Amino acid sequence: SAASDVYKRQDAKYLFANDTCHWILVDTLYISPLLFPERPYHRLVKDDKLICEQMNNPVNDCKKAKDLLLDEIACWNLLSKKKRVLFASLLKDKKEFEGFLSMVSAEYIHEGIPKLIKELYAGKICQHADLDMLIEQYPCGLAYALALIDTTDYRSITPGWVLYNYPEVEFIVKLLRHTTCHEGCDYCHTQLDILYNLKTFFGYECFRTYEGEPLQERATQAAVEGKSLLAIFPTGGGKSLTFQLPALMAGRSVHGLTVVISPLQSLMKDQVDNLADRGITDAVTINGMLDPITRSLSIQRVQDGEASLLYISPEMLRSKTIERILIARHVVRFVIDEAHCFSSWGHDFRVDYLYIGKFIRKYQQKKKCKNPIPVSCFTATAKQKVIQDICDYFKQTLDLNLDLFASTASRTNLHYSVIHVESDNDKYLKLRELVAESDCPTIVYVSRTKRTKELAGKLTRDGYKALPFDGKMEADEKNANQDAFMNDQVHIICLL
């Protein structure tokens, strides 16, 4: 892209300065994403220069550019006549495309373009989208958006350089494919219907209710409609589905990425594994529990468009690698789990959470977003001061108003008791007694890292097989211990 722009700015003005020159300037770079949208990269691969110290080979570059041009011409001719007319009519006055369109003797129309789009993309876009506005204001972006919509693989993504030069592409795809119309159409009634997609992705017929309240369904619908929200769900109340379903829907409709920010690394792995067990491989996590090879593969999956859900910890937002891979993707929503960590009134306050708004603002500026990226916040804490702190934070940093979804239902399946003991030895004996009585998966919380290993070892020696889990363990050991607990190989895990 850079070389192409340098050529047009510096070399072309000398080559074409003579009025007697009748050469046509064709830039294959701009044509490739239109004709090869399944590939998120330019098809001109310089495989003779895989080592960065090697010298450029301009002759070979020219040969490859010629081969690419011939491929593009062949692909253009394979398009239906109506699709050729559509692309040509959208791009006819644009310098980036005029050379190629002249070379292929493209035909144009001046009227009836919206009707042609509706005919060619029936069932793929909302039939009530404002096509006249898009054609008038964003013809190039619309052409690239339609090319992406044509792809059969939802993991295909628009190349980063296209998004940089035509940032409106993401806005257009969202308008055409992920904005529910008020009038109602076949596309919106199926692809944007949450009950239809709940059955498609998870096999459920209906959403969970809380003492008759359809909280899960209402919060999911709000997310699909692009609203920012704060949901107060009881622990184990199905909050994951509330953001996973909209994320999967957006992955299919706009090739989008939902970023889930959580301080709980073990929970990230658990959710990714649970989705994989359902045959949903769209989720990826990048955190400190990963070894370098697995981390590299996860990053590659995000870059290649294979991920619709990315789980990261808040401190990862300071990583330049994370920023780079997110800039190249269409981020449709930020989900913040354990949102009470924003509030300085709680014991779980985390300074890294205060960077989230700054990161989102910087991301929106770099991507030249036309609309704010919505956020979903989840917490099980319903204290009014904490709720106000969360709402105030997003209003002040991103000018977002959060719709509140709070359940009045209480957790009837939880029982608490406080047991008095005189000494540490009495405490251990009572714990061992409780473990023996229960004979079920048990999590024992301790206050110090060293105690996780000490207590797990002591329980194991007494015949109650247990494993430790804390932040200072090696990633491989943490993953192995978590898997052993989740797969019922051990019933007790000692957690910091």
Which residues are covered by each model-predicted region?
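Interdomain "pre-motor" coupling segment immediately N-terminal to P-loop NTPase/helicase cores
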Residues: 136-190
